[in-house]
């Protein structure tokens, strides 16, 4: 059931099957351990089961978050609670709770806010055994504070029916978005609440340089009707026609198309684009450190990532032993067709870049930045 408070939702998942619990009482691991978790230490599993519970803050889509938490509970007999929060909301929450977090692990969402948390010493380093499954060390933090699980491509989603009705061509480049003909037709997300928006800011700075990027955002803002709370917000508005052009991750657009919105076209910007690494991490000072470590090991296995596409998430996976979602390639996406994104610059400067973004826009945009 849901427990709603402020902007947060929390679901208590049911306990694992009674048989699993009985086996655990007698010191036996559930049979499911023999699947993809075979490299996980028996001592870690036992220590995690003794703690008995885990709280997850999730920044991926809730359908996948719920499934991943339920799978972990079924595998290990550990009670899981979760909250679905945007990445910036998680960062704000753990900053306020520094040293005594109410959650144990962070799951999903772009790594720009994760890197802010690394810089603020809010994440616990952990050398995961299953990190050997990563296709490249580029998909983990150099200090082992977070590990990547998926990769999402940034781009545009457009409502082809509305564009045709308006007699407009679809934008093909980032600069196209500033054309006067798109006034009031575009939605982005709010960098105060969504890591996706921070990625957009970093991407433009890396592609254009800082000052030119700020001028770009001033021009783009004239065409933006709303900055949504969630990074996936624009994708959900395109199909129904609430916005004509949404900027966000293209896997969110795939989900909308498969939900029946065949009026959506996905566009990879011709002048280049960047990507998110969706990650997972342990909060420093968490109440259940062994269960948190076990979660990291689990997240780096097919048991966790292969169920993403079964639950509406079609990002590319960054584990060598995972099965890529065929839907991503069917819609023409290429996980390697991206710029060489500078994560260090993003980590060191994103807070200042967000301040500069709002300073460039001034007060005129305030009522368009959604927080609910």
Regions found by a protein language model. Name each.
Residues 68-76:
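A short alpha-helix/helix-coil micro-patch that ends at or immediately precedes a cysteine
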Residues 152, 216-221, 227-228, 260-284:
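Periplasmic-binding protein-like
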Residues 274, 278, 283-341:
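Mature extracytoplasmic/periplasmic domains
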């Amino acid at each position: 059931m849901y427990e709603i408070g402020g902007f947060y939702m929390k679901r208590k998942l049911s306990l694992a099957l009674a048989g699993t619990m009985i086996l655990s009482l007698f010191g036996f691991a559930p049979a499911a351990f023999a699947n993809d978790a075979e490299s996980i230490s028996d001592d870690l599993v036992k220590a995690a089961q003794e703690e008995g519970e885990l709280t997850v803050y999730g920044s991926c889509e809730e359908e996948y978050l719920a499934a991943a938490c339920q799978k972990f509970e079924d595998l290990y007999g550990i009670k899981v609670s979760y909250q679905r929060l945007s990445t910036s909301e998680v960062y704000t929450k753990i900053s306020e709770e520094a040293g005594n977090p109410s959650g144990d692990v962070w799951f999903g969402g772009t790594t720009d806010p994760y890197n802010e948390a690394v810089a603020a010493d809010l994440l616990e380093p952990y050398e995961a055994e299953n990190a050997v499954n990563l296709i490249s060390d580029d998909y983990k933090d150099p200090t082992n504070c977070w590990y990547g699980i998926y990769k999402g491509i940034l781009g545009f989603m457009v409502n082809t029916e509305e564009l045709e009705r308006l007699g407009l061509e679809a934008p093909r480049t980032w600069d196209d978005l500033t054309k006067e003909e798109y006034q009031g037709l575009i939605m982005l997300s709010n960098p105060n609440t969504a890591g996706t928006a921070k990625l957009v800011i970093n991407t433009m700075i890396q592609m254009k340089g800082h000052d030119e990027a700020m001028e770009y955002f001033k021009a783009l803002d004239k065409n933006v009707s709303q900055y949504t709370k969630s990074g996936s917000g624009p994708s959900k508005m395109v199909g129904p026609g609430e916005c004509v052009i949404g900027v966000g991750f293209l896997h969110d657009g795939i989900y909308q198309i498969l939900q029946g919105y065949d009026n959506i076209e996905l566009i990879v910007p011709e002048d280049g684009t960047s990507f998110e690494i969706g990650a997972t991490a342990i909060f420093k000072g968490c109440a259940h450190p062994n269960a948190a470590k076990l979660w990291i090991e689990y997240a780096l296995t097919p048991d966790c990532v292969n169920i993403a596409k079964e639950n509406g998430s079609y990002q590319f996976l960054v584990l060598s032993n995972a099965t890529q979602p065929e839907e991503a390639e069917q819609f023409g996406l290429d996980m390697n067709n991206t710029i060489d994104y500078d994560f260090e610059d993003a980590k060191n400067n994103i807070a200042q870049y967000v301040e500069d973004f709002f300073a460039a826009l001034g007060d005129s945009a305030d009522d368009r930045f959604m927080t609910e």
